[in-house]
Amino acid sequence: MKGSRKVYLLFFWLFSVSAMAQINTDRMMLMGRNALYYEDYVLSIRRFNMVISAKPYLSEPYFYRGLAKFYLEDYTGAEEDCGAAIDRNPFLPDNYRLRGLCRINLKRYEEAVSDYVKLLEIEPKDESGWHNMTLCYLQLKEYDKAVECIDRMLGYWPQKAPLYTLKAQAYFAQKDTAAAMASIDRALEINP
């Protein structure tokens, strides 16, 4: 009887410790996000490291740690964390958006384009995704693809004057002055 009582006590003690671990990782996530909000990026990275060591299968702490690293301009580390988050959950668009930004800062535009393509598969009307992909194509001097992206954006947001000026920039780079001037005229019609 005494031995079974010890087994029950041990069972309840282990159960309560594992329940506290659950509460602590949730709390660490909250503390890490709060530190991120208050721009204490080093502290937030520490908090997310604790969550990752306790629950490495979650994607969220990798994303937030990557976001903190991005703000600290550790683009390589942020890209790796976004990749780890994508490995764990490939259906969250923020992971692709952040990894694309990291790759732009690392001047790896082709890889950034592939991230934005995946982002736009998940969220087809993501304005920042379309815009950043267009900028990548401009950096790669693939002006036809940039114009194609801008035309898609204009299909979603036809009254955005900056899109026409961006289109004019692509046309000027192609030395198509007439098309560039037509785009600028359209931008001025929308926003004089």
Specify the residue positions occupied by each region the protein language model found.
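Helix-start (N-cap) detector for alpha-helical repeat units in TPR-like alpha-solenoids
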Residues: 24-26, 59-60, 93-94, 127-128, ...
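Register position in tetratricopeptide repeats
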Residues: 37-38, 71, 105, 139-140, ...
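N-terminal leader/linker segments that initiate helical-solenoid repeat arrays
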Residues: 19-64, 71
